[in-house]
Amino acid sequence: MNQSTIPLRLLYKGVLFLLVLPFLLQAQVTTDRYQGYGKLILADFKHSMFPHHERYEGHRFQDTLFFHPDTHYSDRSVAVFIPTGFKPTKRIDFVVYLHGWYNYLDSVLLRYRLIEQFAASQKNAILVVPQGPKMAPDSHAGKLEEPFGLQNMLSEALIVLKKNKIIRRGSIGNIILSGHSGAFRGIALMLEKSSLRRKIREVYLFDGLYSRQDKYTKWLSRYRGRFVTVYTTDGAAEKSTEAMFPMLREKQIQFCNTNDFDVTLDDLRRERVLFIYAPIPHDEVVYCIDQFLNLLRTSSLKNSVSPKK
């Protein structure tokens, strides 16, 4: 996130978070909370986002606040969710979700209802949510910014699935990348550099197109994937989102810009490149209107159950 575009609201939020930080850092993901939706596995990955050499000495934000590496960049946790009805196949499809600033894994899963929405989509895929910068104003994606970062993490996810007897064998299939706010940086760099970029079929950004529009445009031009971004005026991403429009026109990439109140499931299925303006708060854009669920429902992922006639 460009520091010059950071709204004061987010800075105030960061100060409040720092006041309760000691309590939040002790929070643990409660896996049995989601038993009704499937199986949630929380594991420490060797190939997690962090620790990473660019944050070994921590992170200083705007030359004022310092975020210590032991507190904010040492958590190797990765949540792997297997929905009820999942059927193992030769190639395992993944949906990877990256969180934004000032967050931690349990809060991400609970507040944004990721597991509930993912399970309701009835797609035959695995949800992977890695811990990013923990309770820090930082868009760095750690190892996922490296060419083999995504491949290593998903390969390790396959090992976790095998150890838990979810699958007997399998390789990495199609991939959907999604994320909120500061996740834009990690997703953009994976589209540009990842060894798995040919397998990335779709991208969902929730109020996060703050910069690197050129990388998203280049990916759309080269790989013709599906790209949907939901943006608001609340998170300071409106102008930077609309700055991508002329880039798409220059590459002769057709796109649709619409209002959330007007968009239908048919629109989501039909439009390959879609910008959706949503007049809702920045921090509610993922879950308030079940947009994550609707995007998954209309995705190219196979269903885990036969759709009702």
Regions found by a protein language model. Name each.
Residues 27-93, 256-261, 304-308:
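A domain-start/cap signature at the N-terminus of enzymes
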Residues 142-182:
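Gly/Ser-rich "nucleophile elbow"/oxyanion-hole loop immediately N-terminal to the catalytic nucleophile
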Residues 230-309:
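C-terminal catalytic histidine-bearing segment of alpha/beta-hydrolase fold enzymes
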